Regions:
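Conserved small-residue
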Residues: 1-180
Length: 180
């Protein structure tokens, strides 16, 4: 925290801290051999500590997430991956945030998930997928099984931990991104 002890500074400090975490979707373009940011592009957006994020999967609305169906913010983002339907995944590496930051209404169970954002839909929802588990997510790799289901491999960044594998019940639908 950057809190100095002066309560008058607290709202601005809180805003700045929340804006400094998370990730960004940016449009870059190669011009004359150099990669450049396309300023003011409709696809550019931030996912920070204040962004509303939808919870999906079996923990949504349960006591495991304090009854939440939506949480605010993404923290401790590490690596991620790309889905078969060309959205981006970002992994929240840590699961214990609430008291460490001193942010009101931020509870630990809202962090430690895999987050999905569609870089081609600037107005689309950001989602945290509870079906992929809650732990110190390091990364994801996605593949399709021979019978068409989606497999997500995930590493745990905590010391002496595991490698996880999620297999979907339904098959991958290449013509309907929302069905995946």
């Amino acid at each position: 925290s950057t809190f100095t002890g002066n309560l008058a500074d607290y709202p601005e400090m809180l805003r700045m801290e929340k804006e400094a975490v998370g990730g960004s979707v940016i449009h870059v373009k190669k011009e004359k051999g150099e990669w450049k940011l396309v300023l003011d592009d409709t696809y550019n957006r931030r996912v920070d500590g204040s962004t509303p994020i939808e919870l999906t999967g079996p923990a949504r609305g349960t006591s495991a997430v304090g009854g939440a169906t939506q949480v605010f913010g993404s923290l401790g983002n590490c690596s991620g991956g790309r889905t078969l339907w060309n959205t981006a995944l970002s992994c929240e590496e840590n699961t214990e945030y609430g008291d460490d930051y001193g942010w009101p209404n931020f509870t630990d169970e809202h962090y430690g998930w895999v987050m999905e954002v569609d870089p081609f839909n600037a107005k689309g929802p950001v989602r945290k997928h509870t079906a992929l588990g809650r732990f110190a997510h390091e990364n994801t790799a996605m593949r399709q099984t021979k019978d068409g289901r989606v497999v997500v491999y995930m590493g745990d960044d905590a010391r002496d931990q595991c490698f996880y594998k999620f297999i979907s019940k339904k098959t991958f639908n290449p013509t309907n991104r929302e069905a995946n």
